[in-house]
Regions:
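Metal-dependent nuclease catalytic regions and adjoining charged, substrate-binding loops involved
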Residues: 4, 38-41, 51-136
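Non-catalytic protein-protein interaction segments used by genome-maintenance enzymes to assemble
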Residues: 1-46, 51-54
């Protein structure tokens, strides 16, 4: 099918190079608890950072992804989590993004009312209206 390009703008918190020449892309986080496996290894944000790094001159380099987390627990602490992404994981995310974009472009709207962000979301009224109208 037709290949379309889209620009994505964002800010990476920190990019470093280690002694071996690997690129380390770090995302700073604040959380109320330690991160679990899924939060580290399935996070789409750092997958996008890796894709951006590869598209901007780092495709021939080893890329490590890191979360630097300040945990706001009863006794605050700092934890680091390292992860990597495979080509399959990159392509999986690209496919998901394309599929969602195609849906949005076609007028498909499916609210995610299970998110913790829902109560303060700017689109809350649109979601509520969608449910009131029967989801059509």
């Amino acid at each position: 099918g037709e290949v379309r390009r889209a620009e994505l703008a964002g800010h990476v918190d920190l990019v470093e190079e280690d002694d071996s020449g690997a690129v380390i892309i770090t995302d700073w986080k604040t959380a109320g608890r330690a991160y679990g496996y899924d939060e580290v290894n399935r996070n789409p944000q750092v997958t996008l950072y890796q894709l951006a790094a590869k598209a901007n001159g780092f495709s021939d380099r080893e890329i490590l992804l890191r979360f630097d987390c300040l945990l706001k627990t009863q006794k605050p602490r700092f934890e680091q989590y390292y992860t990597i992404r495979t080509e399959v994981e990159e392509r999986r995310l690209i496919r998901k993004i394309r599929t969602v974009w195609e849906g949005i472009s076609s007028g498909v709207f499916i609210p995610n009312d299970t998110s913790w962000r829902c109560p303060n979301c700017h689109y809350r009224q649109a979601c509520d209206q969608w449910f009131l109208e029967g989801g059509d």
